[in-house]
Structures are given as structure tokens and as C-alpha cells.
Amino acid sequence: MQVDATYLTANEYHNPMEPHASTVLYKADGTLEIHDKTQGTQNCQDYLHKVFGLPKASIRVRAAFVGGAFGSGLRPQYQLPLAVMAALHLQRSVRVTLTRQQMFTFGYRPRTEQRLRLGADVNGQLLAIAHDALGQTSRFEDFTEHVVEWSGMLYQCDNVALSYRLASLDVYTPLDMRAPGAASGMIALECAMDELACAAQIDPLELRRRNFTANNANEGKPYSSKELLACYRQGAERFGWQNRNPQPRSMRHGNQLIGWGMAGGVWEAMQMKASAKARFDAQGHLTVCSATTDIGTGTYTVMTQIAADAAGARVQDVTFVLGDSSLPTAPLQADRLRCRRSVRPCARPARYCAPKCWNMRAGCTPKWPARPGSRSFSPMATCTRAAIAWPCRTSSPAPLTVSSKCKSTPSPAPDANRSPPLPIRQYSWKSTSTRTLAQSRLHG
């Protein structure tokens, strides 16, 4: 059996509670201190450095708190260069704030037109998937999203064809917004799965169970973790899925007609270079800093907890500082880009390098505790990811500083003993080839 359906998704605008605003403090020495609504202070710093030719040392961007962004702060919006331009020209401090109406004048989630074709056997097992998507962009810049690849990784299917094309329109360039690409692409895939369940007269939850896969077929690798089957089971139990009647207009809640449905989702966990610095003062208080931001995801709290756990300290004895471009490098703060993996290896050495009672005050050399499973422990020898400096034999200990830099781990070299990768995942439909379909969408 086959399902062939076309789905349209509309534009969506971020419109967070806090509108975009930039305050540029022009200092007497010509340097700029900028308070901006951004998900990446160092990204804004780099942008201004390239646009205005200013040295990075003369630009400091801060974003202590961000009142929501949803992706609209991943790149600088136009109020930032306007504020900097005015400040440099007037040689005085300037603030530019966008109105609520102006919040509709820049990036947005682009509209899409997607065609999903599914082929399955009588038991609902997927035999072929073809997902073709057409997205929009501006005429002066290409904006692409990961719209179709989710269809090749969420379910088990050996024959998959994916295509994505752009149509240049007289509009402003779109922008990443809350699970960019997946939020649009998964709508089409899951709607098509529901239509397949209806055509095959199979419960939509059971259909997804039958097509579950533990591997990402797009990359030929197993998932590091995937608890989707357990999620299916718990969700069905808690919502009473067994009481669902699949017939339309068959279920009521009081005087209202209701329907029960479900859908799956998938999202990527990206890792980028990140770094942090940890500092113990003479009172034993740990301060950890990184140039990441808090966009309402609780970064202040989470990073403080991670640092406290790694250092063996109380939460109230740890302070996490963020939102400053002068701090150690961190990636853009988004739902899939985190700096937490740099905080733990940074704070952990401090656990051994700073005795809880600061016995160095008495002029004695601290005794480093042995790491479990090792004969002895030497901070300089074992903390390969950290550059550590600490005082020795001093009656007035200087602060202890630990810095850590992490980057994503490269993929291991291919193993000769492993099975060869799957052949190119293609499926040729009898109606229209992928190439012809894409061209007709662009030029039709």
C-alpha cells in the first residue's frame, strides 16, 4: 500500500517576550561595551569586528539575561549595527530598541511545501520513503534547513530518497527557530505515518512500534541512547491509549467531539568547542565562568550544579558567571549547543587542587587525594584537559585558577573489521523522479 500526500507549513515569527535591543556604551578611550539581546556574545563581537573593522579587544558584549529568543538571537539583528554605527559617529552612548511591530521585520521560520510518499507491506512495515521539500529564502542570501533527513533516521526503512530545494523570493532571509527544519519536516512525516496507519487499519502507535529502529540509517551508526519504545509504552499507559476509538466522531468529552492522536519526534545533539575557567578564592568559594548565555533554559542553575558536583562543593559555595564576550570561548546558546561538557572537566581538577579546609594557610603543603583505581594522583599528570596553577606552601594562599578547553571528539577511524556501509539510499518511484519533481517545484 502507498501514501502520497503534500503538506504545507506556514511562516512563524519568534516574537519572544523581550524585544531585541542594543545598548552601546561609548567609553573615553574609544572602546565599546555593549549590552545586547543575543544567544552568543562572542558571535556578536566577531560580527562587529568584521563589519566595522574594530579590534576585538575594543568590543565587549554582555548579555547577562535574555528574555526569550527561540533562535532569533543566534545572529545579530539590525538594531545592533545601527546602534554601533550611531555610537561611533556621535561618540556617545546609544540605545536602539525594536518595537513589537518591528519584530516582524527580520528572520522567521520559513514556509515549506513537502511531499511525502510512503510504501509499506500489508503488515505496515515500511518498504520505501520519499520526502521532497521546497523551502523559501531571500534573493540575497541562501538559508537552508534540515527538513527531510529526519525521514531517513526515525524509522526502519531500507529504501529512502530525500531532496530539498530552495525558492528565492522577495522576502527577508529566514532564521533558525525552535528545532529548525525538524519542526517542519516531522509534521509531514508523522502526518503521513498517520495516513498510512489509517489506510492499513493499524493502530498508529503500533505502526510506529513495528518500524522502530535502533540505528541512524543516514549515518549507518547506532543511537547512543534511544528510549522511544519505553516512551511509547509509558505514554500509552498514562493516557489510557487502549480506550481510544479510531473511528472519526466516535469519542466525546461532554458535549465536545474529541480525537486522540500521537506523534514522534527526533532532534540532534550537537557539540562545539567550548571552554571554561574555574577559580577558588582564599575563602574556598569557587567561581566558574564561560561566555555562554542563559536564554531561559536555566544555564546559571545547571552550570552551578555541574560545577559543584564536579568540585565536590556545596551549591551555595559556587558562582557561575556567563554572558560576557571577554570570558572563555563558548558556542552559541541554543537547545542543541551547550557548554556544559567544558564545565565539568574544568571544575573536577579543582576538587583535588583545593583542599576543603585550605590547610595551606598553616604553611603546609596539601596532600593530594588519590584518584579511585590509581596508585597515586598528580593533578598536573592526570588532568590532560586542564591547565592548572595553584600555590604551594604559603600562609596567604593566592586564588586557584583552573581552565579547561573542550571540543567535539572526532569520529574514530574506520574499522576494517566492521561491515561495509549500506549502499546509497535511493528509491525510484514509477510516477516522477526526484530530480524532475524538484525542478518542477522551483520553476513551476
For the regions a language model picked out, list residue spans one by one:
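Structural alpha/beta core scaffold segments of enzyme domains
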Residues: 1-444
